[in-house]
């Protein structure tokens, strides 16, 4: 108790900084009962005294090697535990109990400050390091500094995921990879579009992400931007070829009622939400088919509506095959529903021309080899190429890509009716698929030995079979099972499907022969300088719709350079420019995958929007229908669609989605 009294008296005689230190360590002093511990607890940190370093060096004694080692270890402690490390360091430098060596309080703390100032942290200069990636290693780190490498810029642009690669600057002009009839006057996204205020990702996949964009000139016009990313160890040239091929196929298949329209291939700049690259400006869908099937209310949807959706998807597939293109990745995620209930195919990332000569539709069929598509909807002949299954190479035979699409149609029909996918993989390792194959053979052996023969329209499996129980119609189950035939040689083709009497009798909500009127984006700003003296405000006035009478006859504001070059606002040199070449029927094969070394030629014409489709002849729908307000009179809605729309609008606010390629 005497030691405690004397010590407290000495502390009270210290300057104000020592008194504040006493308050800081007050709880420790009151809780201590041992004299030696009390003496150690009263040591102050170096921040509360002002003794010079030179004086402390002259008065501080030499310490044993063991104490030096412990002091050096404490100097490398983390900065967040600085108080604890200082306390332990000052405790370790005290002489043992009963020692005759006396160390003054000032010298003791100045020695601690000197030792810490000689540490590695104190001797180095401060470096601006906001991300903390250049911090040198300490005794707490198990990896040496020489083994660490600073990440590149992509590390920060992708939230630390350095595996995602970015295209080098400058981004290549998309017109260098497009045929002449598909070249664009505007290749910059920022020329005519802005990102939606929500800035949400509405779709994503392994090679892309989808966001909403709006027109600069009409905010209510909303479109989808499919931002494409590099995959695996893809080189920039392979990336450009892959994306341009997908755009050419999607553009070729546009203008059909059951195909999602693709408008532009543009360059996307680096923003807060996206990285630089290429992107598609596409029609925005309301919801994909998979999101509707997984809702609990889908079970109550009538079979007539499900069959209507199936027929719309089949019409889209048939149109692709008629154009010489195989989709090769059919699944509910790649089927979009428009606001008026029309089903549309999307995502042509792995689609391809299935003729040896894409220009000649009568040329032989080009077969495929390798693992393509999604396992639940890929046929058995494709699953033989799965490296994880280790199938015998003799089973890996080239296959017709059209048969792959037909098999996917059969699985989609089963999924629509049964509300779940029938099995996970179409291979012998999946128990569900093995049961399906056994049931298939049992039905042929016990009920209909001619089930696989062409032209046989007898009823298919009934209630006794698990995957045919919910069809409640033998003819409907026949179509589903014939499309999903495990044997590719006897599987239904797209022509066999459209010749089936049951399929022909399905009532649909839209006629596939009708022209779908889709709102196209307004293009006012061009990327290139037009060589024919194009004046944007003058030429666009006749094609830009407006309801404001004050804007119709408004004289545009012109710069002095424009006035000097063209004194008359309507002066053009159309006579000197050659007429544009007629559009080609097919895409030149050499233009699809050839990189031009010269810059793109100046565009002679400006495409403000695609040519409006010809007005089709009125055709009566094949089922009771209702007109859609504000749309073409030929666009009708099925009488069962109100159930589907109730499922769509019951979702969350982020209901618009365009599936991305996987």
Curated annotation (Swiss-Prot):
Q: Pfam families in the record, alphabetically?
A: Pkinase
Keyword annotations for this protein? Answer: ATP-binding, Kinase, Nucleotide-binding, Serine/threonine-protein kinase, Transferase
Q: Which reaction does it catalyse?
A: L-seryl-[protein] + ATP = O-phospho-L-seryl-[protein] + ADP + H(+); L-threonyl-[protein] + ATP = O-phospho-L-threonyl-[protein] + ADP + H(+)
Q: Which PROSITE patterns match?
A: PROTEIN_KINASE_DOM, PROTEIN_KINASE_ST
The ranges of region (Disordered) come to: 35-119, 605-631
Q: What is its EC number?
A: 2.7.11.1
Active-site residues, record numbering mapped to chain:
329
Cite a single GO BP annotation. Answer: spermine transport
The biased composition feature labelled Polar residues covers 61-91, 98-119
| GO terms for MF | ATP binding; protein kinase activity; protein serine kinase activity; protein serine/threonine kinase activity
Q: What does this protein do?
A: Essential determinant for low-affinity spermidine transport.
What family is this? Belongs to the protein kinase superfamily. Ser/Thr protein kinase family.
Q: Which PANTHER family does the protein's record reference?
A: MAP/MICROTUBULE AFFINITY-REGULATING KINASE, NON-SPECIFIC SERINE_THREONINE PROTEIN KINASE
Name-wise, this protein is Serine/threonine-protein kinase PTK1/STK1
**Which species does the entry assign this protein to?**
Saccharomyces cerevisiae (strain ATCC 204508 / S288c) (Baker's yeast)
Q: Name the gene.
A: PTK1
